[in-house]
């Protein structure tokens, strides 16, 4: 049966841990290699479909596939028949017919990845679909790389207190992180203005707060979210300056964190708004470590979906 990764809820604790373990193994296997190539996905075709702008996610999926010797093909809306009016369904069926083993999709519509998996389903030869971010819904591989970074920095995730700050309403990263961190045993606190919290958020497995200063001293990690102005139609807060004063991670606020705490950001960062440059570049920041881990996590995800966890992840 074709396997997909559409939401962080698809992963059990054991499955998520296995992916994180294999991500670490891939990292170690590539360490010191002059040529960063493993034969794991030789002969497989991986197609990325990005209908929204992306740097980190698109590049890391491409690098992940190439480091595993897959044939990686990039499809963008502007450079394909989508620009001529072709529907997502017809594009998906075309790529399935062309022999794709995996389709990695980023799309502005929530639920696009699920729809893609349903359209391309077949008795045989259906590609695995990986959600690389669908609207405000989810971004499961981002949650996995964040979890890997936390595990490396903190020594574990069970019982850790993770504070997620900012535009939760429009954040697929927040949704996937809440699901995965809860699965892995972390305590999650959401800090945001009331206007940037989803309806029904108090039914999530989280604590909700509007006071960032009160939450920082007990935090093991802080995940700062970008304000997604491109998804906003109205005034969700009075001004960027007021938002930064109330919810930005400034140098002064960083001093409230324990010395062992970790600062995460999925990027792109709005320096000076949700995070100061000095905090982003400080020793507590794991932003670049997240990027490195993104490649290894996506290697592990491709391996688990296309090869199977029962086979050896690393070979010469």
Swiss-Prot record:
Pfam families: OTCace, OTCace_N. Catalyzes the condensation of carbamoyl phosphate and aspartate to form carbamoyl aspartate and inorganic phosphate, the committed step in the de novo pyrimidine nucleotide biosynthesis pathway. It catalyses: carbamoyl phosphate + L-aspartate = N-carbamoyl-L-aspartate + phosphate + H(+). Pathway: Pyrimidine metabolism; UMP biosynthesis via de novo pathway; (S)-dihydroorotate from bicarbonate: step 2/3. The keyword Cell wall biogenesis/degradation does not apply. Its EC number is 2.1.3.2. One of its GO terms (cellular component) is cytosol. PROSITE patterns: CARBAMOYLTRANSFERASE (PS00097). Heterododecamer (2C3:3R2) of six catalytic PyrB chains organized as two trimers (C3), and six regulatory PyrI chains organized as three dimers (R2). InterPro entries: Asp/Orn_carbamoyltranf_P-bd (IPR006132), Asp/Orn_carbamoylTrfase (IPR006130), Asp/Orn_carbamoylTrfase_sf (IPR036901), Asp_carbamoyltransf (IPR002082), Asp_carbamoyltransf_Asp/Orn-bd (IPR006131). It comes from the Bacteria. Belongs to the aspartate/ornithine carbamoyltransferase superfamily. ATCase family. One of its GO terms (molecular function) is amino acid binding. L-aspartate binds at residues 84, 172, 226. This is Aspartate carbamoyltransferase catalytic subunit. GO terms for biological process: 'de novo' pyrimidine nucleobase biosynthetic process; 'de novo' UMP biosynthetic process; amino acid metabolic process. Carbamoyl phosphate binds at residues 56-57, 106, 139, 142, 267-268. SUPFAM superfamilies: Aspartate/ornithine carbamoyltransferase. Keywords: Pyrimidine biosynthesis, Transferase.
């Amino acid at each position: 049966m074709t396997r997909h990764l559409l939401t962080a809820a698809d992963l059990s604790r054991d499955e998520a841990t296995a992916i994180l373990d294999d991500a670490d193994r891939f990292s170690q296997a590539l360490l010191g290699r002059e040529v960063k190539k493993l034969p794991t996905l030789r002969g497989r075709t991986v197609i990325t479909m990005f209908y929204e702008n992306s740097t980190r996610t698109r590049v890391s999926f491409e690098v992940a596939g190439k480091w595993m010797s897959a044939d990686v093909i990039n499809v963008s809306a502007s450079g394909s028949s989508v620009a001529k009016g072709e529907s997502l369904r017809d594009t998906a069926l075309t790529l399935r017919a062309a022999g794709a083993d995996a389709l990695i999709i980023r799309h502005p519509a929530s639920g696009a990845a699920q729809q893609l998996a349903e359209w391309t389903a077949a008795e045989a030869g259906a590609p695995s679909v990986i959600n690389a971010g669908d609207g405000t819904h989810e971004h499961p591989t981002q949650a996995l790389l964040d979890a890997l970074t936390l595990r490396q920095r903190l020594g574990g995730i069970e019982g850790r207190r993770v504070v997620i700050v900012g535009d939760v309403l429009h954040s697929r990263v927040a949704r996937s992180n809440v699901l995965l961190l809860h699965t892995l045993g972390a305590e999650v606190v959401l800090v945001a203005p009331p206007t940037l919290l989803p309806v029904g958020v108090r039914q999530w497995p989280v604590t909700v707060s509007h006071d960032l200063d009160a939450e920082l001293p007990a935090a093991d990690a802080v995940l700062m979210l970008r304000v997604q102005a491109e998804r906003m139609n109205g005034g969700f807060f009075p001004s960027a300056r007021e938002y930064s004063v109330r919810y930005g991670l400034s140098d002064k606020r960083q001093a409230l964190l324990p010395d062992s705490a970790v600062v995460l950001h999925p990027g792109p960062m709005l320096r000076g708004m949700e995070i100061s440059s000095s905090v982003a570049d400080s020793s507590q920041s794991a932003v670049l470590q997240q990027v490195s881990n993104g490649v290894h996590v996506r290697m592990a995800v491709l391996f688990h979906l296309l090869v199977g966890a029962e086979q050896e992840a690393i070979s010469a």
